[in-house]
From Swiss-Prot:
It comes from Rattus norvegicus. The lineage of its organism: Eukaryota, Metazoa, Chordata, Craniata, Vertebrata. Coiled coil: none annotated. The keyword Transport applies. The chain crosses the membrane at residues 71-91, 104-124, 136-156, 171-191, 198-218, 261-281, 302-322, 325-345, 348-368, 382-402, 416-436. Glycans are attached at residues 38, 46, 53. Residues 26-70, 125-135, 192-197, 282-301, 346-347, 403-415 are extracellular. This is Lysosomal proton-coupled steroid conjugate and bile acid symporter SLC46A3. Residues 1-25 form the signal peptide. One of its GO terms (molecular function) is copper ion transmembrane transporter activity.
Length: 461
């Protein structure tokens, strides 16, 4: 008998992703350090091998390593851009007819293959450039936005009432905060006690368990239409997919289309900033003046992951006195303050304290997705989240590529510049939300917007 709880799959995937990101960043950093300096990277119990005297040759060497690590991360992200965009859009769009499990299964297979390859690379000390090839192949199966988009659409399929949906998403954010916080906290100890190869192997085992749960225990609320599969060729299915995407923006009133476009713009720009700055945090903490080791990096990652937990509490508390749009404002402005403070942080204590200002960072993402789900019909949820995941994939790769490029160009004269730039970019989603408010967004007004039933969009020609 199959069950309809998507939460275990989300939590297992979150554990794997939260552990993979800091591990890979530090693995690349150490490999480039050793290849550039021709000697082994070491770390003490307090700080990494780091020189803070700017006149020292070691300081110049560290800056060179940071530049190379940033540029290599740029190559890796770009390699997965095109296949990730295509696979994400096609898998999530087709999930309205073929079920939500297919995108979850394929993206999990991609994650499994990538982590097994990283395990082999670190164990056999294979050339670092092979990571670019594995990223490209893994992206053909989808990526994290494919998985999250399918999971969110799965929840929307089950929870028809908006209030129940918000509660379930908020509880999920709470659980994600606990899992990612503990994972981030332990990431440094994984590296120190087990090394990179065994850490990646453990991640692969977790992904395999998650894959088994999705395949054999998770039910699918979307029933596959066998008649449509028989009568529609591959080209007709692709044509139908793009036509339904076109109808998503064509259907409805001008107000509905305006709200849809503005909310998507707000979500994508905010995601661009928040996701793009994440890998830079690790490089910023590894270099001077902080010079953190893998354990401190884990502490910082754990504090950052607490934003899931604190965002859940924030949504729960603020929902009693604030509207959705105002809750999103709170998250945007506190994140903006955190970016500005990070740019001027020079001590470990201050860096930990600055993380507090990021505690509501996840709130706008959860609120904006819920607001978007209000303005489309239930039969358009898959197409909507396919568009969102497509844009998030594009924005995620573009942002990490841009931030890595900017950081490598500015680290020598001012490492904190990217954080000031991020604070400035966050003005855009704030202004966009103002426009949403001016158009006339009201809590509950979505019931009028989705009464425009989507017209038939099967491709007959």
């Amino acid at each position: 008998m199959k069950i309809s709880f998507i939460e275990p799959a989300i939590l297992l995937y979150a554990f794997a992703m939260t552990l993979t990101i800091p591990l890979t960043a530090q693995y690349v950093y150490r490999r480039i350090w050793e290849e550039t300096g021709n000697y082994t990277f070491t770390s003490s119990s307090n700080v990494s091998e780091c020189e803070q005297n700017k006149s020292s040759s070691t300081f110049a060497f560290q800056e060179e390593v940071q530049k190379k690590a940033s540029l290599f991360s740029l190559q890796v992200e770009i390699s997965g851009l095109i296949p990730g965009l295509v696979s994400t859009f096609m898998l999530l769009s087709s999930s309205d007819n073929h079920g939500r499990k297919l995108p979850m299964v394929l993206s999990s297979l991609g994650s499994l293959g990538t982590n097994l390859w990283l395990c082999a690379m670190s164990y056999f000390d294979l050339p670092l450039q092979l990571l670019v090839a594995s990223t490209f192949i893994g992206a053909l199966f989808g990526n994290y936005t494919t998985f999250w988009g399918a999971c969110f659409a799965y929840i929307v399929d089950q929870e028809k009432e908006y209030k129940h949906r918000i509660i379930r998403i908020a509880v999920l954010d709470f659980m994600l905060g606990v899992v990612t916080g503990l994972t981030g906290l332990s990431s440094g100890y994984f590296i120190r006690e087990l090394g990179f190869a065994w850490s990646y192997f453990i991640i692969a085992v977790v992904v395999l368990v998650n894959l088994a749960y999705i395949l054999f225990f998770l039910s699918d609320p979307i029933k596959e239409s066998s008649s449509q599969i028989v009568t529609m060729s591959c080209s007709e299915s692709l044509k139908d997919l793009f036509y339904r995407t076109y109808m998503l923006f064509k259907n409805g009133s001008c107000k509905r289309r305006s709200l849809l476009c503005l909310l998507i713009f707000t979500l994508v720009v905010y995601f661009f900033v928040v996701f793009g700055i994440t890998p830079v945090f690790t490089l910023y903490e590894l270099g001077p003046p902080l010079c953190w080791n893998e354990v401190y990096i884990g502490y910082g990652s754990a504090l950052g992951s607490l934003s899931f937990l604190s965002s859940f509490l924030g949504i729960w508390l603020f929902s009693y006195c604030l509207k959705d749009i105002h809750i999103a404002y709170v998250g945007i402005f506190t994140t903006m303050v955190g970016m500005m403070l990070t740019a001027f942080t020079r001590t470990t204590l201050m860096m930990f304290l600055v993380r507090i200002s990021f505690f509501f960072t996840i709130m706008p993402l959860s609120i904006l997705r819920s607001m978007l789900s209000k303005v489309v019909h239930s039969t358009e949820q898959g197409v909507l989240f396919a568009c969102i995941a497509f844009l998030e994939t594009l924005g995620g790769v573009t942002s990490t590529s841009a931030y890595n490029g900017i950081y490598s160009a500015t680290v020598a004269w001012y490492p904190g510049f990217v954080f000031l730039l991020s604070a400035g970019l966050l003005v855009l989603p704030a202004v966009s939300l103002c426009m949403v408010k001016c158009i006339g967004w009201e809590e509950g007004s979505y019931t009028l917007l989705i009464h425009d039933e989507p017209s038939e969009h099967t491709s007959d020609s």
